[in-house]
């Protein structure tokens, strides 16, 4: 399993809240990645970190939600998030999707908020010291410098990919690691939006 960044934890916590809202409001109906981000933004309209999030980077945030649920013996709330094309969870999802969705819909999520805060704090404490957050402008400048000297490696990078790379660099990754993570997410999740 890859290491979570501060960005994964912050956005993952917001996605958790949106998924709980989705589970309650729709009895466990699936929600596409892009719509999930939109729902989370509507619940937290002033959250700048969430505002920068893009569907291509949603995989690690959902893994954070999944890890939280698994650590407390809850149904996998992340199973509600689905790919726009396949209408199914990402290829890394293991389990009986229909049964998991029913379990998510029946579960009482009311008492989980405090546990999420505690889990997020302990996960933040486990983030390696080398993952030092930086501001958006320095991350953008560093990405541009990397992009200019590695154009061939960056040939398939879209505008949405670039935004997630900047998000990851703001969370402390170097440009090469951020690019590798985004390309791996594209391979794993395909067209996530």
Region spans (language model):
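N-terminal intrinsically disordered, low-complexity, charged/polar
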Residues: 1-14, 172-173, 178, 182-193
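Active-site-proximal segments of catalytic enzyme domains
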Residues: 18
């Amino acid at each position: 399993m890859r290491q979570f960044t501060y960005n994964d934890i912050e956005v993952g916590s917001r996605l958790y809240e949106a998924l709980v809202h989705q589970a309650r409001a729709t009895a466990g109906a699936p929600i596409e990645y892009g719509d999930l981000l939109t729902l989370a933004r509507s619940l937290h309209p002033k959250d700048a970190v969430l505002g920068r999030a893009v569907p291509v980077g949603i995989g690690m945030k959902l893994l954070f939600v999944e890890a939280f649920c698994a650590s407390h013996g809850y149904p996998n709330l992340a199973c509600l998030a689905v790919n726009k094309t396949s209408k199914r969870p990402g290829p890394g999802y293991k389990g009986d999707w229909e049964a998991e969705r029913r379990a998510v819909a029946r579960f009482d999520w009311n008492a989980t908020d405090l546990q999420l805060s505690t889990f997020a704090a302990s996960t933040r404490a486990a983030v390696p010291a080398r993952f030092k957050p930086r501001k958006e402008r320095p991350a953008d400048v560093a990405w541009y410098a990397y992009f200019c000297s590695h154009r061939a490696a960056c040939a398939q990078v879209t505008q949405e990919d670039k935004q997630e790379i900047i998000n990851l660099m703001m969370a402390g990754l170097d440009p090469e690691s951020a690019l590798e993570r985004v390309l791996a997410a594209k391979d794993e999740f395909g067209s996530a939006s």
